[in-house]
């Protein structure tokens, strides 16, 4: 999937390929940055803008981000790791909690 955001400093459109897990009506993405201590720019941009667009196959969908927390995050984390085991490996490289973000269709 490709996530499109607007750069918080540049104002330019940015496109980033991201892995996703389908969870109900949401597409869940992991802001891992391969385990780096820095939060990925796409998440900073999306959080500041409050919305973005994703391209899944031939569909373009306007989305709003929602940071997963608590028990919901824990449950979805293990589903994400099952889909992409490398995600668990990333936690060894950083002290930050890797954000899991539900991208929800705008207007729902």
Predicted regions and their residues:
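Short beta-strand segments
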Residues: 1-32
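Short, structured beta-strand-loop surface elements
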Residues: 32-87, 92-99, 105-107
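Short loop segments at secondary-structure junctions
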Residues: 24-25, 106-108
